[in-house]
Amino acid sequence: MKAIFSLYNIVSAILLLVLLAEFSTAELNHDKNRRGANMGLYAFPRVGRSDPSLANSLRDASDAAVFDGLYGDASQEDYNEADYQKRAGLVAFPRVGRSDAELRKFAHLLALQQVLDKRTGPSASSGLWFGPRLGKRSVDAKAFSDASKGQQEFN
Protein backbone atom coordinates (compact mmCIF):
# COMPACT_ATOMS: atom_id res chain seq x y z
CA MET A 1 0.00 0.00 0.00
CA LYS A 2 2.84 2.38 0.86
CA ALA A 3 4.59 1.54 -2.42
CA ILE A 4 1.48 2.47 -4.47
CA PHE A 5 1.06 5.69 -2.53
CA SER A 6 4.72 6.68 -3.04
CA LEU A 7 4.53 5.68 -6.74
CA TYR A 8 1.49 7.98 -7.07
CA ASN A 9 3.49 10.83 -5.50
CA ILE A 10 6.44 10.26 -7.85
CA VAL A 11 4.20 10.19 -10.95
CA SER A 12 2.40 13.35 -9.77
CA ALA A 13 5.68 15.14 -9.18
CA ILE A 14 7.03 14.17 -12.63
CA LEU A 15 3.78 15.26 -14.29
CA LEU A 16 3.91 18.56 -12.42
CA LEU A 17 7.51 19.17 -13.53
CA VAL A 18 6.71 18.34 -17.16
CA LEU A 19 3.71 20.70 -17.18
CA LEU A 20 5.71 23.44 -15.50
CA ALA A 21 8.51 23.09 -18.03
CA GLU A 22 6.04 23.15 -20.94
CA PHE A 23 4.22 26.25 -19.77
CA SER A 24 7.40 28.12 -18.90
CA THR A 25 8.85 27.57 -22.41
CA ALA A 26 5.55 28.61 -23.95
CA GLU A 27 5.73 31.84 -22.00
CA LEU A 28 9.30 32.48 -23.16
CA ASN A 29 8.35 31.89 -26.80
CA HIS A 30 5.32 34.15 -26.44
CA ASP A 31 7.46 37.09 -25.31
CA LYS A 32 8.91 37.46 -28.80
CA ASN A 33 5.55 38.61 -30.15
CA ARG A 34 4.89 41.13 -27.40
CA ARG A 35 5.79 44.77 -27.53
CA GLY A 36 8.73 45.99 -25.55
CA ALA A 37 8.38 47.64 -22.17
CA ASN A 38 8.96 51.12 -23.60
CA MET A 39 6.84 50.79 -26.75
CA GLY A 40 4.23 53.13 -25.30
CA LEU A 41 6.77 55.93 -25.03
CA TYR A 42 7.26 56.35 -28.78
CA ALA A 43 4.89 58.72 -30.52
CA PHE A 44 3.64 56.99 -33.65
CA PRO A 45 2.76 59.26 -36.55
CA ARG A 46 -0.92 58.82 -37.18
CA VAL A 47 -2.16 58.32 -40.71
CA GLY A 48 -5.58 59.14 -42.12
CA ARG A 49 -8.29 61.74 -41.77
CA SER A 50 -10.31 62.10 -38.63
CA ASP A 51 -13.47 63.26 -40.38
CA PRO A 52 -14.40 61.96 -43.84
CA SER A 53 -16.51 65.07 -44.48
CA LEU A 54 -13.30 67.12 -44.46
CA ALA A 55 -12.12 65.68 -47.75
CA ASN A 56 -9.21 67.44 -49.45
CA SER A 57 -8.59 69.53 -46.31
CA LEU A 58 -11.71 71.63 -46.88
CA ARG A 59 -13.66 72.79 -43.86
CA ASP A 60 -17.13 72.54 -45.37
CA ALA A 61 -18.56 69.24 -46.60
CA SER A 62 -20.43 70.98 -49.44
CA ASP A 63 -17.16 72.57 -50.67
CA ALA A 64 -15.53 69.15 -50.58
CA ALA A 65 -18.37 67.68 -52.65
CA VAL A 66 -18.02 70.45 -55.27
CA PHE A 67 -14.24 69.94 -55.37
CA ASP A 68 -14.66 66.19 -55.86
CA GLY A 69 -17.24 66.82 -58.60
CA LEU A 70 -14.85 69.06 -60.52
CA TYR A 71 -11.71 66.98 -60.26
CA GLY A 72 -13.06 63.49 -59.74
CA ASP A 73 -11.37 60.67 -57.90
CA ALA A 74 -7.71 59.96 -58.42
CA SER A 75 -7.10 56.63 -60.09
CA GLN A 76 -4.13 54.28 -59.92
CA GLU A 77 -3.02 55.45 -63.38
CA ASP A 78 -2.41 58.97 -62.03
CA TYR A 79 0.41 57.78 -59.79
CA ASN A 80 3.81 56.58 -60.87
CA GLU A 81 4.49 53.28 -59.12
CA ALA A 82 8.21 54.02 -58.80
CA ASP A 83 7.45 57.20 -56.84
CA TYR A 84 4.90 55.52 -54.61
CA GLN A 85 6.33 53.47 -51.77
CA LYS A 86 4.61 52.30 -48.67
CA ARG A 87 6.15 53.87 -45.62
CA ALA A 88 6.78 51.17 -43.05
CA GLY A 89 7.28 53.66 -40.22
CA LEU A 90 3.72 54.92 -40.30
CA VAL A 91 1.13 53.11 -38.24
CA ALA A 92 -2.52 53.50 -39.18
CA PHE A 93 -4.61 54.17 -36.09
CA PRO A 94 -8.39 54.11 -36.26
CA ARG A 95 -10.02 57.29 -35.11
CA VAL A 96 -11.99 56.55 -31.97
CA GLY A 97 -14.37 58.78 -30.08
CA ARG A 98 -16.42 61.80 -30.93
CA SER A 99 -15.13 62.95 -34.29
CA ASP A 100 -18.30 64.56 -35.62
CA ALA A 101 -17.82 68.21 -36.58
CA GLU A 102 -21.03 69.28 -34.85
CA LEU A 103 -19.99 67.62 -31.60
CA ARG A 104 -16.60 69.33 -31.75
CA LYS A 105 -18.29 72.67 -32.32
CA PHE A 106 -20.70 72.06 -29.42
CA ALA A 107 -17.85 71.04 -27.09
CA HIS A 108 -15.93 74.19 -28.03
CA LEU A 109 -18.95 76.40 -27.34
CA LEU A 110 -19.59 74.64 -24.03
CA ALA A 111 -15.98 75.19 -22.92
CA LEU A 112 -16.18 78.85 -23.95
CA GLN A 113 -19.41 79.29 -21.98
CA GLN A 114 -17.81 77.76 -18.88
CA VAL A 115 -14.86 80.16 -19.13
CA LEU A 116 -17.20 83.14 -19.49
CA ASP A 117 -19.28 81.97 -16.52
CA LYS A 118 -16.16 81.83 -14.36
CA ARG A 119 -15.15 85.34 -15.37
CA THR A 120 -18.53 86.95 -14.73
CA GLY A 121 -19.86 84.71 -11.97
CA PRO A 122 -20.24 85.58 -8.27
CA SER A 123 -16.76 84.24 -7.45
CA ALA A 124 -15.09 86.28 -10.18
CA SER A 125 -12.35 88.67 -9.17
CA SER A 126 -9.87 90.73 -11.07
CA GLY A 127 -7.03 89.01 -9.27
CA LEU A 128 -5.62 92.35 -8.02
CA TRP A 129 -5.66 93.53 -4.42
CA PHE A 130 -6.01 97.28 -3.97
CA GLY A 131 -6.03 97.26 -0.17
CA PRO A 132 -3.11 97.67 2.21
CA ARG A 133 -0.19 95.29 2.08
CA LEU A 134 -0.76 92.25 4.21
CA GLY A 135 1.77 90.14 6.03
CA LYS A 136 4.88 90.70 8.08
CA ARG A 137 6.83 93.81 7.31
CA SER A 138 10.51 93.72 8.08
CA VAL A 139 11.20 96.77 10.24
CA ASP A 140 14.36 97.33 12.17
CA ALA A 141 13.44 97.76 15.85
CA LYS A 142 15.99 100.56 16.40
CA ALA A 143 14.84 102.52 13.36
CA PHE A 144 11.24 102.09 14.49
CA SER A 145 12.00 103.49 17.98
CA ASP A 146 13.94 106.44 16.47
CA ALA A 147 11.04 107.27 14.18
CA SER A 148 8.53 107.15 17.03
CA LYS A 149 10.60 109.62 19.12
CA GLY A 150 10.20 112.30 16.52
CA GLN A 151 6.43 111.96 16.43
CA GLN A 152 4.29 113.71 18.97
CA GLU A 153 0.68 113.21 19.84
CA PHE A 154 -1.55 116.21 20.08
CA ASN A 155 -4.50 116.07 22.43
From Swiss-Prot:
Keywords: Amidation, Cleavage on pair of basic residues, Neuropeptide, Secreted, Signal
Keyword Lyase: no
Pfam family, one: Periviscerokin
Leucine amide modification, residue list: L134
Residues of the signal peptide: 1-26
Cellular component, GO annotation: extracellular region
Propeptide: 27-33, 50-85, 99-117, 138-155
Primary localization class, coarse: secreted
Intracellular or extracellular location(s): Secreted
GO molecular function, one term: myostimulatory hormone activity
Gene Ontology biological process terms, A to Z: neuropeptide signaling pathway
Described function: CAP-1 and CAP-2, but not CAP-3 are ligands for the Capa receptor. CAP-1 and CAP-2 are probably components of the signal transduction pathway that leads to Malpighian tubule fluid secretion via the second messenger nitric oxide.
The protein's name: Cardio acceleratory peptide 2b
Organism classification: Eukaryota, Metazoa, Ecdysozoa, Arthropoda, Hexapoda
Gene name linked to the record: capa
